[in-house]
């Protein structure tokens, strides 16, 4: 896709980092294993998958790596993967054992805490938002991640409508990936603590699964009284962008965010209250109600991450903190040090760094063979806005300036000045 896109725009071709044959060969290497059972992953390496409490199928991985010295015990490593919070729908919380040499832990919410909420509290919060959007008179758009978040929303909406807490508002699920994921959730619902038999907890007469592009486009004619759940969750791709284009300019419409919005994404910009955004190359004024519901997170917060780490100690040789924005990584590192760890053994690895791990001593940093793929200051920018955001803002500012200019000569003068800067 990127190759074709560059060709259409007259840009240089992109050298692929792998071929289709290589991708298909990699897929043939996939083997299904059961959780909570040790497997021989390679000579001298055992692995075990345990429930991470994040989404259906998410797992932490325990490794035991045999020492080259026969008298030395195997090194024990734990990779957290994404860790789920306590009290999450469809989950009993993260599982696993303790007593490791090294722990690698995620830090998505390493610097913040959320208010704990029960199932009843979560549904009450969703009910308030849906009723407020319904009263406003427009459609309710919910950008949602296709796996787990969408199914949680459907489950809660079905339950609220079944008990009469919400009117049976038409709900449209407009995400091909979410449709496929929902069938998987239905197949394995017994693993979610839901009854194996009976009606699907994700379906009802007023829940409509949108399967074709034509059906999705038809939703653009809706003006009120509907809930549209579509991906992507951060509004960076998918069908939600078309629904935003159709509804953001309507003051009676509502956009409800139910998940994390990375800095620089359209979702984050809308939450910040920008007056306009660019979608599909067009400026769209933001008049819709922008709301957020922070009760569906799939990630443990600071308090829960520290509890997860504490329950898996000791980590004799070190802890690596990964997968987070700079503030989250630094915040969680400080908190882990406060637990009594030597700061030198609580490591926030940088891109392209390589470490050698030893069962009897601390991890050793090996200098990368080549220069980092990012410029010195670029890593700090990865989690924030990039030039694409600046470009979109510049285009919007230029359009506003041209519209506010009274006469044609003044507009042409402004454009000439800009062109001189570019030369």
What role is predicted for each listed range?
Residues 188-216:
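Long, charged amphipathic helices and adjacent flexible linkers at domain junctions
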Residues 49, 84-86, 163, 168-190, ...:
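A short, flexible N-terminal coil/short beta segment enriched in small residues
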Residues 89-108, 179-180, 185-192, 261-286:
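Short, compositionally biased "basic patch" segments
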Residues 115-197, 315-376:
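Binuclear metal-ion centers of metallo-dependent hydrolases, dominated by the metallo-beta-lactamase
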Residues 55, 81-83, 107-108, 145-147, ...:
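Active-site metal-binding loops of divalent metal-dependent hydrolases
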Residues 1-170, 191-194:
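His/Asp/Glu-rich metal-coordinating catalytic cores
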Residues 159-162, 207-423:
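C-terminal regulatory/interaction regions
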Residues 107-123, 142, 201, 287-307:
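Glycine-rich phosphate-binding "P-loop"
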């Amino acid at each position: 896709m990127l190759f074709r896109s560059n060709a259409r725009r007259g840009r240089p071709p992109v050298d692929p980092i792998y071929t289709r044959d290589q991708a298909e060969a990699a897929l043939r290497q996939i083997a299904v294993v059961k959780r909570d059972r040790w497997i021989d992953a390679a000579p001298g390496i055992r692995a075990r998958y345990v429930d991470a409490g994040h989404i259906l199928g998410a797992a932490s991985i325990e490794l035991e790596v045999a020492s080259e010295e026969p008298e030395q015990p195997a090194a024990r490593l734990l990779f957290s993967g994404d860790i789920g919070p306590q009290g999450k729908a469809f989950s009993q919380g993260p599982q696993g054992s303790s007593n490791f040499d090294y722990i690698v832990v995620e830090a998505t919410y390493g610097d913040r805490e959320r208010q704990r909420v029960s199932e009843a509290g979560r549904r009450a919060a969703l009910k308030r938002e849906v009723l407020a959007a319904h009263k406003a008179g427009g459609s309710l758009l919910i950008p949602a991640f296709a796996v787990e978040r969408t199914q949680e929303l459907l489950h809660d909406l079905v339950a609220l409508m079944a008990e009469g807490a919400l009117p049976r508002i038409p709900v449209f699920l407009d995400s091909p990936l979410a449709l496929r994921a929902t069938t998987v959730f239905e197949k394995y619902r017994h693993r979610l603590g839901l009854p194996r038999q009976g009606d699907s907890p994700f379906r009802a007469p007023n829940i409509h699964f949108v399967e074709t592009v034509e059906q999705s486009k038809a939703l653009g004619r809706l003006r009120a009284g509907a809930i549209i759940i579509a991906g992507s969750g951060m509004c960076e791709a998918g069908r939600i962008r078309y629904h935003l284009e159709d509804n953001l300019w309507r003051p009676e419409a509502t956009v409800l965010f139910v998940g994390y919005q990375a800095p620089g994404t359209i979702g984050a910009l809308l939450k910040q209250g920008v007056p306009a955004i660019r979608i599909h190359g067009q400026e769209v004024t933001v008049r819709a109600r922008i709301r957020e519901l922070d009760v569906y997170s799939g990630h443990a917060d600071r308090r829960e991450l520290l509890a997860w780490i504490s329950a898996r100690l000791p980590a004799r040789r070190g802890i690596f903190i990964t997968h987070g924005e700079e503030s989250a990584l630094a915040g969680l590192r400080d908190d882990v040090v406060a637990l009594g760890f030597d700061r030198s053994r609580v490591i926030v690895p940088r891109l392209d760094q390589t470490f050698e791990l030893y069962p009897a001593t601390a991890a050793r940093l090996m200098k990368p063979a080549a220069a980092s793929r990012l410029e010195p200051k670029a890593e700090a920018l990865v989690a924030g806005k990039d030039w694409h955001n600046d470009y979109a803002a510049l285009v919007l500012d230029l359009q506003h300036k041209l519209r506010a200019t009274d006469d044609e000569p003044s507009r042409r003068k402004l454009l000439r000045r800009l062109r001189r800067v570019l030369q």
